[in-house]
């Protein structure tokens, strides 16, 4: 499959959904290898890469490095990826079954909370430990996150919450958190950058973005108690002009030397090969690997539903949501009791759990007019619920 590293003067173009800092160390170390080929990275969102590669491959991309199985599934369905065989079993068991013929897992990451200690101290707040904590009223105007439609990394984090807590309880948690958001970041690594700058005190991020910032004493990262494992995948474009060199790079990443480099804290990731017991990062790697895998079939089937629901429920009405939650928190504080009926109006979604797993119904979201009609219905539904919640709050004054 992979071949050996030989001397090439040509340049490899690697499209990636990761930030430049997340790939710099790996590429830097690769390029110290005898006979290695230069790698130029093209850093884009998944959506941007889909558009680029669905048309003529104008940038002459040779391979893809991403944590997004959705992007790879899309490219595979459009016959854009080359077949890859003979990958190690330990690597391939981490790859969703539907893309195993074209994609290889070379590293893993986990999800958690990046926290700005100084910003937290300025507000006299304890650090949040999990999704549930982020919905507490004390974090009003203090949190940041991205959205599934803007970031596939965020999509996987949201799906891990929905799968672990269940559809209904998961959305209730997300909607409670929405009342505490400063803004919705356009990129998942933008969340980390904004927290570092002090725009917010905490936010959910993938560990490799957080770990690269932890030389800043004001920042801390804590994994979610049951963080799902998020593999880093590599795939070769079918029309790559340098397929042998691309395979050589993948071979290097999976080699003992490549895995040692991926084990280095400078990558912010963990290798797929087990770390030795005396490695300080071994325990967290084992915890991640021990978690049940996400249901990727379900993720892929309801990708459109989750993205459109998040934007309709949260992104497109964030200002109104924050006002409604501020009013609810104020009323609960004043009355010194919870208001579950009003809270239920602000934490419900107009799609039930059974529908969220109904593949026949979910397939209809591939029809743009159906999806847009549903979003219009949801907008009205959320607006009516919010108006009713505000009306009930005013009655309590």
Swiss-Prot record:
GO CC terms in record: outer membrane-bounded periplasmic space; plasma membrane
Coiled coil location: none
Topology of the protein relative to the lipid bilayer: Single-pass membrane protein
Entry keywords, A to Z: Cell membrane, Membrane, Signal, Transmembrane, Transmembrane helix
Pfam families to which the protein is assigned, alphabetical: SBP_bac_6
First and last residue of the signal peptide: 1-24
Compartment(s) of residence: Cell membrane
SUPFAM superfamilies linked: Periplasmic binding protein-like II
Protein name (database record): Phosphoglycerate transport regulatory protein PgtC
Organism listed in the record: Salmonella typhi
Taxon lineage: Bacteria, Pseudomonadati, Pseudomonadota, Gammaproteobacteria, Enterobacterales
Protein encoded by which gene: pgtC
């Amino acid at each position: 499959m992979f071949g050996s590293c030989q001397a090439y003067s040509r340049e490899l173009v690697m499209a990636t959904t990761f930030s430049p800092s997340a790939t710099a160390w790996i590429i830097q170390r690769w390029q110290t290898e005898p006979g290695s080929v230069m790698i130029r990275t093209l850093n884009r969102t998944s959506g941007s890469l889909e558009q680029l590669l669905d048309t003529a491959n104008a940038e002459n991309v040779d391979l893809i490095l991403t944590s997004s199985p959705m992007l790879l599934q899309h490219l595979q369905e459009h016959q854009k990826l080359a077949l890859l065989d003979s990958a190690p079993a330990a690597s391939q068991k981490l790859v969703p079954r539907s893309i195993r013929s074209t994609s290889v897992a070379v590293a893993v990451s986990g999800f958690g909370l990046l926290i700005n200690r100084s910003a937290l101290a300025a507000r006299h707040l304890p650090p949040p430990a999990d999704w549930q904590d982020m919905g507490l009223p004390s974090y009003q105007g203090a949190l940041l996150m991205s959205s599934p439609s803007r970031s596939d990394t965020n999509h996987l984090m949201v799906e891990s919450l929905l799968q672990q807590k269940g559809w209904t309880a998961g959305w209730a948690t997300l909607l409670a958190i929405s009342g505490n958001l400063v803004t919705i970041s356009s990129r998942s690594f933008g969340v980390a950058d904004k927290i570092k700058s002090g725009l917010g005190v905490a936010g959910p991020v993938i560990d490799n973005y957080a770990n690269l910032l932890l030389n800043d004493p004001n920042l801390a990262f804590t994994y979610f108690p049951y963080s799902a494992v998020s593999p880093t995948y590599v795939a070769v474009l079918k029309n790559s002009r340098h397929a042998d060199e691309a395979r050589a790079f993948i071979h290097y990443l999976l080699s003992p030397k490549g895995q040692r480099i991926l084990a280095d804290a400078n990558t912010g990731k963990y290798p797929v090969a087990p770390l030795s017991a005396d490695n300080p990062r071994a325990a967290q790697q084992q915890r991640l690997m021990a978690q049940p895998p996400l249901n990727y079939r379900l993720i892929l089937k309801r990708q459109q539903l989750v993205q459109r629901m998040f934007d309709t429920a949260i992104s497109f009405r964030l200002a109104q949501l924050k006002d409604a939650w501020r009013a609810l928190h104020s009323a609960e504080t004043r009355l010194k009791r919870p208001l579950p009926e009003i809270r239920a109006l602000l934490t419900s979604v107009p799609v039930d759990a059974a529908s969220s797993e109904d593949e026949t119904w979910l397939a209809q979201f591939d029809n743009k007019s159906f999806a847009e009609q549903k979003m219009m219905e949801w907008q009205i539904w959320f607006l009516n619920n919010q108006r009713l919640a505000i009306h009930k709050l005013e009655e309590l004054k």
